[in-house]
């Protein structure tokens, strides 16, 4: 009888003991912290991208003409992150394994930041031209193709598998973007004739697609840099990746702005801006802050999850921006645009479902061993009761 009581006590300690309870509490706390960080980065990315896109279109709509300035506001906000180096000192992220190898050399890191900075500059320039020549609703729909580009780049650079759901998403997004080419009577705010409007529409379309490809390549390369070169996943690493490439890209755009002589026209442009000087300044400041918030959110999601997930969240703006464009800019929502939007949303849902399936697999793998242990424990209890 005494042996039965002692065995029962041991069983109780094994199932409900402090070590196991403590472990599960720490695990729950870690998951909560991770979800909180991801939610913050998602909010920064969605709010920043939506506001920045609408402000960029407003700049062109009310008399702004400088694509160099519109490119510059996407990049010049990097000094806003500098105070974070001194006031924020969070612990390293535990969502990924940190290797014990030594930190990459200064030369290697410099090449990484310079290379990414040049790509970011090219992407931003194409973005500015695309937004200039296309209605914001059309531009937003074409930008959804970045998800397809990112899947391809991630396959080669980040060992991402192309599953049936992802393949379905690629096909739908490609068809969605292709449909927008066949719109007859493309709109252009500065067109003087149908032929001129058509040529500008084609240029805008090419620039929008090129911008989407460039953005996707930057995300995949950033993910690759963290995995293979930086090999550390701290908040400081996020700030570094958001700051240094932006610094390089800003230098490139500033050279372009002064080299092209575009800076000479900025004072006249400000004087003639339809909403006035104050609005001109506020729009550009708002764009700068919004783009920097978007950048921090994007890099943060790359570290916490993956470049693919960051791009998926970015495309969540898809149904929001075209609707807001119709409300604020009176963009025409044609039948082709509606079909393109439906296909793009379908592609996004397919992509998102694949990510959901991937997230569920680790949980199911953990549940299987636990269920086996429970069955064994029940058998032990039955034996003890029979004894």
UniProtKB/Swiss-Prot annotation:
Keyword annotations: Membrane, Transmembrane, Transmembrane helix, Transport
Record InterPro entries: PUP_plant (IPR030182)
Superkingdom assignment: Eukaryota
Basic and acidic residues composition-biased segments: 9-24, 370-381
Membrane topology, from the record: Multi-pass membrane protein
PANTHER family given in the database record: OS09G0467300 PROTEIN-RELATED, PURINE PERMEASE 6-RELATED
Name assigned to this protein: Probable purine permease 6
